[in-house]
Amino acid sequence: MSAWSCPPNVLFENPYLDPEESAKIVGCEEFCRHGYEAQQKSIVLLKNSAKRAPEGQKGVLPLKKGLKVYIPERKIGPSKAFFRIDLPAKTEDPLPDGLPSKYGTRVSSPEEADVALVFIESPACNPYSTEDLANGGNGYLPITLQYRPYTAKKAREVSIAGGDFRENFTNRSYLGKTNTAYNEADLDNILECRRAMGDKPVIVCATVNNPMVMHEFEAEADAIVAEFGVSRAAVLDVVFGDYNPTGRLPIQMPKDMDAVEEQ
């Protein structure tokens, strides 16, 4: 589409802004406050066990302020971005700006800590394999909602719909194929923290981008907090009791991958 064919009186009819007027609207204090409150309200408390709760509390959350907190780094394997651009493996700090001092002190090992705070993301994977295609397959892999390797034993033999119009086949079945989440190490972090922390609490904070199978770690977590892309500050408000969580799950969490395939 050439520039000459664009409608003349729409988006760029008046391209000039009034900075003073923009400052009143974009990022104004009132709007930011409402936005932050919306983030807090969306956070869901999925589990709050009494097993390691402080005396006088029904659950382990909220945490008392002033504790020593261990927060492991996340390890993410090679993945694909938009247009299937290759992304290399990386290690990232889930709290790059540090733990605010009003909540507690971040320590470098579980042995020093009073509590472990493990940030994870729902399992993510690459659902297509050029290697599978080169070896005579159709290239399609199962989309796994669990961290450990998943083999699709109960998938359809023939897919409901065909694939790309450029393909010379219509069956995208992935029956019998295996896939693994590229953030499988999130599960390792939870299990390793559970072993290292002994009888001290482990709190899991999950960024939920899609449904996930939680049976792999639910028993190892004293509390599970789910959020859908909010700021870390809002999550910490819930964990340390500055905000009482009121959110509800907008999606179903499957028991296992068999339940996903059979629905």
Stretches with model-predicted labels:
Residues 1-17:
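Long, well-ordered, tryptophan-enriched scaffold segments
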